[in-house]
Amino acid sequence: AFKAVLDGLPFQVNEFSLANYILMKDRDIASMMAIPVFLNRAFRHGSLYVRKDGDLSHPRQLKGKMIGAREYTQTAGVWWRGLMIDEYDLHWRDINWVSEKKQRFAPPAEAGVEALDEDLEQLVIDGEIDAILAPSTNDGKKPKDVQMLRPLFPDTEAAERDYFARTGIYPLNHAVVIHNETLAKFPNAPKLLFDAYCASKKQFYAEGSNLNPWGDETDLDLIPFGLTDKNREIVRTLMRYLHEQLFISNLPDIDGLFVDGVADWVDV
């Protein structure tokens, strides 16, 4: 689905990387507008994988290490690097970055990213690099007794819970985007789609499903749609990270990222 957006192929409505969307808006190459429906959220404390038999267990140990990122501009990576600065005083400049050769967008020159032909996950397993930054690994699909990798933090859930308790931030990764041609043909589509997604989520909850990241029973909706105060704060945080990591030249106006009128839309 992302490929259609990135390659300029025809589409009407799509789920897309929020970081890449903001980057494209900054460069004036976005042929779409977003609506405040955020379909993917995840904490990123568990997104760095190291060798299971290694001694790395805290961000303070990562200065000067070599870390692989398959896609350097991926939203997950943007969140992780920002989190490391805010929470652990680990700057992305303090890391030696390597990536796959094919990238959605060229990494900032200041990051000094070296593109490699090799499989980055295998390089960690072989001890050639120190860690890989990724939402998940192929190694994690294997039986636990033969897995070679583990998350950096010994207790990822505890780190996530502490962060959420202090900040209230449940990181946004993807948003729904609508192609400009579709917007021109169907001006009512954005609000209709927003209402449909809200109704779908309400039905999901009514059937007893749980969208809490840790599986806790709660009456709170941790994935609200719309430009709520908290969602605005989270988008601002992501924009700040993009700016600090030199992906975008300016901090955009949040409302300008979304179709007109969304400030009044309510997720009920």
Regions found by a protein language model. Name each.
Residues 11, 129, 247-248:
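Conserved hydrophobic residue
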Residues 64-65, 171-175, 222:
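Short, solvent-exposed beta-strand edge segments and adjacent coil->beta transition regions
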Residues 108-205:
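Pocket-lining segment of extracytoplasmic ligand-binding domains
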Residues 177, 182-247:
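Secondary-structure end/capping motifs
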Residues 172, 247-268:
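Conserved C-terminal helix/tail region of periplasmic/extracytoplasmic solute-binding proteins
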Residues 29-31, 147-153, 264-268:
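Short low-complexity, flexible loop/linker segments enriched in glycine and/or proline
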Residues 1-93, 97-100, 104:
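Short, glycine-/small- and polar/acidic-enriched structural segments
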Residues 1-4, 57, 93-126, 217, ...:
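Short helix-initiation/N-cap motifs at beta->coil->alpha
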